[in-house]
Amino acid sequence: MGESDVRLTAWVHGRVQGVGFRWWTRSRALELGLTGYAANKPDGRVQVVAQGSRAACERLLDLLTGGNTPGHVDKVISDWGEPADAIAGFTER
Protein backbone atom coordinates (compact mmCIF):
# COMPACT_ATOMS: atom_id res chain seq x y z
CA MET A 1 0.00 0.00 0.00
CA GLY A 2 1.19 3.47 -0.82
CA GLU A 3 1.35 6.43 1.54
CA SER A 4 -1.69 8.10 -0.01
CA ASP A 5 -3.85 4.97 -0.15
CA VAL A 6 -7.38 5.03 1.23
CA ARG A 7 -10.13 2.57 2.06
CA LEU A 8 -13.55 2.99 0.48
CA THR A 9 -16.53 1.15 1.93
CA ALA A 10 -19.63 1.45 -0.23
CA TRP A 11 -23.07 0.04 0.57
CA VAL A 12 -24.91 -0.48 -2.70
CA HIS A 13 -28.72 -0.56 -2.52
CA GLY A 14 -31.13 -1.74 -5.22
CA ARG A 15 -31.50 -4.87 -7.34
CA VAL A 16 -27.83 -5.82 -7.06
CA GLN A 17 -27.87 -9.49 -6.05
CA GLY A 18 -28.18 -12.34 -8.52
CA VAL A 19 -27.40 -10.10 -11.50
CA GLY A 20 -23.59 -10.33 -11.77
CA PHE A 21 -23.00 -7.13 -9.81
CA ARG A 22 -20.17 -8.48 -7.63
CA TRP A 23 -18.39 -9.97 -10.65
CA TRP A 24 -18.74 -6.67 -12.52
CA THR A 25 -17.45 -4.73 -9.49
CA ARG A 26 -14.48 -7.08 -9.12
CA SER A 27 -13.57 -6.61 -12.80
CA ARG A 28 -13.72 -2.81 -12.55
CA ALA A 29 -11.71 -2.79 -9.31
CA LEU A 30 -8.97 -4.99 -10.77
CA GLU A 31 -8.79 -2.75 -13.85
CA LEU A 32 -8.21 0.17 -11.47
CA GLY A 33 -5.52 -1.68 -9.49
CA LEU A 34 -7.59 -1.87 -6.30
CA THR A 35 -7.71 -4.60 -3.69
CA GLY A 36 -10.71 -5.58 -1.59
CA TYR A 37 -13.97 -7.44 -1.97
CA ALA A 38 -17.65 -7.25 -2.88
CA ALA A 39 -20.02 -9.16 -0.60
CA ASN A 40 -23.75 -9.90 -0.70
CA LYS A 41 -25.56 -8.99 2.52
CA PRO A 42 -28.71 -10.70 3.85
CA ASP A 43 -30.76 -7.49 3.45
CA GLY A 44 -30.15 -7.37 -0.32
CA ARG A 45 -27.33 -4.84 -0.36
CA VAL A 46 -23.82 -5.39 -1.67
CA GLN A 47 -20.92 -4.17 0.47
CA VAL A 48 -17.91 -3.07 -1.54
CA VAL A 49 -14.59 -2.56 0.26
CA ALA A 50 -11.75 -1.22 -1.88
CA GLN A 51 -8.25 -0.10 -1.00
CA GLY A 52 -5.82 1.80 -3.18
CA SER A 53 -5.22 5.31 -4.42
CA ARG A 54 -7.91 7.89 -3.72
CA ALA A 55 -8.24 8.58 -7.45
CA ALA A 56 -8.85 4.90 -8.25
CA CYS A 57 -11.35 4.52 -5.39
CA GLU A 58 -13.18 7.66 -6.52
CA ARG A 59 -13.36 6.27 -10.06
CA LEU A 60 -14.80 2.98 -8.74
CA LEU A 61 -17.39 4.94 -6.77
CA ASP A 62 -18.28 6.88 -9.94
CA LEU A 63 -18.73 3.58 -11.78
CA LEU A 64 -20.92 2.15 -9.00
CA THR A 65 -23.24 5.17 -9.22
CA GLY A 66 -22.99 5.71 -12.99
CA GLY A 67 -26.01 3.71 -14.12
CA ASN A 68 -24.16 1.19 -16.31
CA THR A 69 -23.99 -1.60 -13.73
CA PRO A 70 -25.71 -4.97 -13.84
CA GLY A 71 -29.10 -4.85 -12.13
CA HIS A 72 -30.32 -1.52 -10.84
CA VAL A 73 -28.59 0.68 -8.26
CA ASP A 74 -30.96 2.85 -6.20
CA LYS A 75 -28.29 4.49 -4.06
CA VAL A 76 -24.75 4.09 -2.81
CA ILE A 77 -23.68 5.14 0.66
CA SER A 78 -19.92 5.55 0.94
CA ASP A 79 -17.50 5.87 3.81
CA TRP A 80 -13.82 6.80 3.53
CA GLY A 81 -11.06 5.77 5.88
CA GLU A 82 -7.48 4.76 6.29
CA PRO A 83 -6.47 1.45 4.72
CA ALA A 84 -6.78 -1.50 7.06
CA ASP A 85 -4.67 -4.63 6.88
CA ALA A 86 -3.38 -5.44 3.42
CA ILE A 87 -5.90 -7.29 1.26
CA ALA A 88 -4.63 -9.54 -1.53
CA GLY A 89 -6.48 -9.18 -4.82
CA PHE A 90 -10.17 -8.37 -5.15
CA THR A 91 -12.65 -11.12 -4.32
CA GLU A 92 -16.35 -11.86 -4.41
CA ARG A 93 -17.74 -12.97 -1.08
Swiss-Prot record:
List the SUPFAM superfamilies hit by this protein, alphabetically.
Acylphosphatase/BLUF domain-like
Question: Key word NADP present in the record?
Answer: no
Q: Which keywords label this protein?
A: Hydrolase
Q: Which family does it belong to?
A: Belongs to the acylphosphatase family.
Give the Gene Ontology MF terms in alphabetical order.
Answer: acylphosphatase activity
According to UniProt, the reaction catalysed is:
an acyl phosphate + H2O = a carboxylate + phosphate + H(+)
Give the protein's recorded name: Acylphosphatase
Q: Domain Acylphosphatase-like, which positions?
A: 7-93
Active-site annotation: R22, N40
Q: Is Hydrolase among this UniProt entry's keywords?
A: yes
* EC number(s) reported in the record: 3.6.1.7
User: What PANTHER family does this protein's entry cite?
Assistant: ACYLPHOSPHATASE
- What broad class of enzyme is this? hydrolase
